[in-house]
Each structure stands twice: as structure tokens, then as C-alpha cells.
């Protein structure tokens, strides 16, 4: 077999790679996603080499112009790397030498692919975090606008998937806005550790060439530099942290999706899916399927899997760089795509894909025993110990179930057989709207408290 002279590292070898191994080893098919970031990092590195006098300013300018030419060719669809290029870094370097000649060979001075790929991945992820943050804001706004319209719409609240207490629908939707805010805060925190430059750490031990890591860090708008070169090239904590934050985003979306799926079923019938976000059956003409939330619920497992894969990958790696790290790219690329698409899909679903069936919701909150706690509270207000009141109401509910009658339908005389303290005002307490309105503790579902939450979120999201 002929010697693989096309490889930058081939002079150490006498024979070329087995074709299958060459393809197995290559990452160009997916790390081409890092092209923009690789060019940005290389331009910053070239400028630094010129400033430091490691190459002449003219050479630095030629390198930068050549890299910008590659950017233009890529934009025009003319930059087409092949498997033999191995990865995006070698593909760029090879193309640069083709464009500007031997001076292109000076670009890699004082740099290794180990610190280069870490830099590229951080630059790429920094942008994607900012994009996901905006996608989360869109979801928050979609939920908020629906919540603002439904302050006085009531919906059953559940524990153990059993009806518990009625809620303001706005309160229910605001809970997911809170989750999304925590997701945003987590991403903001992860971004701080993404935004540290490894460039200049070289292969693992730094370099003897008089580079300036601070110059490249500033050029690329990093917050600072790694203080340990070994850690710089071997750190993938930021990938794990991002995948952890992404997993929680998907967990929240999956919970929301599950509720939409339940609400759309005939058994709940709380919402009607519009034609814009539902599909039909190839066999059963009556079906309208909640494919969007089902897909999001299913896709959550992909991101969870990538997190587990990354943790498993890094747990046994000795310092410093190992080829295993190549596996982080597809995990993070797919996770970003999955999270972004899922956020957009769920946002569209709440913007134009569902309608709450208010008559059905009203029927649901008026035909159960979710007001039982308020009967106990009624007695507590008359100085009966809560546990005693709780036990009494339990017996009342048992009687109601046995007789097939709701609490609101007991005549006053029957109420008094349970306890002498029951008066006519018990009926007002039993109304679902009264039950909700009375929950005035901070963060509660009482209309006043929810209105306060709505005003606060409008200020945060729209000002």
C-alpha cells in the first residue's frame, strides 16, 4: 500500500491507513459543523502570531485572508472536504496551503488539534446556548399569553393523577414558565464554564513558542483562559453540564407533553387539537393524534442517552487528550438539534395547536370532591382541630360516595347531622371559584396571587 502522504502526520509512518480504518477514524462528516468556529479560532491564532512576532504581520494577514477565502468558498458551496481530510482542522489547513502556498504551513505554530478542537467546540456551544435561551423565552411567552387569557378558567389539579384541588389554568401554565426559567438559569451558569479558552494549551503541556493566550482569548471573547494546560485539553465537564441542563429541559417538555396528551384524550377532553398541529390515522378516520407532544416525549430519551454516554466515556480516561473525545461531537450536535426542535414544536403547539374546552373544564371541577379540603378548612376556622376536621370530612365524603351525591347537593339539614357548626355559608365555600380564590398564600393559585405572578412575568418577558 502506498504511503499516505496526504496526512499531516504521515511522515512518521511507512504505510497508509486501511480504507475502512481511515473512514472509521475520520470525523469530517460531522465535525464540519465546526467550520465557522475553526476559522474564527484560526484567524485569532494567526493574528496573535503576527502580534507576537512569531510570524511577520504580512504573513499573518495572508493567513487571515486565506481563511476568509475558505469561509466564502464554504458559503458558496465550493469547500467540499473528503474522508481523507480526516477532520475539519486538517481540511481547513490543507485548503489554506492550496490557496496561499507554503505560508499556510505556519498557521499551526504553537497549536495542537487538542486545544484547537476544544476551542472550536466551546465557540460553537456558546452560540447554541444563546439560541436555546431564546427558544426557551419563546416557549415562556407562548405559555404566558395563554395563561393571561385564562386567569379565571379553572382546571382540576392532580396528585397521583387523582383529582386533588381545583386550580386557575393560568397558575398551571405558569408552573411550566417557572421550570423554563430554571432551565435558562442553568444554561447561563453552564455558559460561564463553556466560555473559558483552552487555546494555547497545545497538545497537553503548553508550548515553548512565545504565544499569548490572553490575546487569542480576547479576540474570541472568552471570559478567561484555563490555568492548567492538562486540564484545558482534557476537560469535557462543560459538555456533560450542558447535556445535563439539556436533559432537564427535555424532562420538562416531556412532562408538559404528557399532560397535553392526557388532556387531548376523550377520557379527559380538556383540550381540542387544531388541524395545524395534529395528524390522522391511515386506518381509523375518526382519529386526531397528538403527534407533536408524543414525539417530544419520545425524543427526551435521546438527550438522556447522550448524557449517560458522555459520563460513561469520560469516567475512565487518563490525562490528557484521548481519541474517545471525538464521541462528544455527535452527542452534543444531536442534543442541541433535539432540544431546539422540541422547544420550537411545543411553542407552536401552544401558539396555534390547541384550544381549551372551557365548558368541559368547568364540568370537571364541579363534579368531584376536590373541594373536600375546604370543608375541613371551614371547620378549622370554627376552632375545630384540623385532624379532627379532616377525619370528619373523610366520613362525609365516604357517605357522599355511598349515596351517589356530591357535597354541594347535600341539604343544610343533612350537613348539620354531620356537625352543628355547618351553616348556609358552606355552599359558598364549596364553589370551585371560591376554593381557588381562597388560596391566597404566597405562590398559591388564588386569583390575586396568580395575577401578581402574571404581572411579574409580563415585566420579565416583555420589557
Swiss-Prot record:
The reply on keyword Nucleus is: no
Where does this protein reside within or beyond the cell?
A: Cytoplasm
Entry GO CC: cytosol
Judging by the UniProt lineage, the source's domain of life is Bacteria
Q: Which Pfam families match?
A: ASL_C2 (PF14698), Lyase_1 (PF00206)
EC class (word): lyase
Answer whether the UniProt record assigns the keyword Lyase to this protein: yes
**EC no.?**
4.3.2.1
**What catalytic reaction does the record list?**
2-(N(omega)-L-arginino)succinate = fumarate + L-arginine
Biological process according to GO: arginine biosynthetic process via ornithine; L-arginine biosynthetic process
Task: Write out the pathway annotation from the protein's UniProt entry.
Answer: Amino-acid biosynthesis; L-arginine biosynthesis; L-arginine from L-ornithine and carbamoyl phosphate: step 3/3
GO molecular function terms attached to this record: argininosuccinate lyase activity
Alphabetized UniProt keyword annotations: Amino-acid biosynthesis, Arginine biosynthesis, Cytoplasm, Lyase
Q: Tell me the InterPro entries matching this sequence.
A: Arg_succ_lyase_C (IPR029419), Argininosuccinate_lyase (IPR009049), Fumarase/histidase_N (IPR024083), Fumarate_lyase_CS (IPR020557), Fumarate_lyase_fam (IPR000362), Fumarate_lyase_N (IPR022761), L-Aspartase-like (IPR008948)
Q: Which family does it belong to?
A: Belongs to the lyase 1 family. Argininosuccinate lyase subfamily.
Q: Which PANTHER family match?
A: ARGININOSUCCINATE LYASE
Please give the name of this protein: Argininosuccinate lyase
Gene this protein is translated from? argH
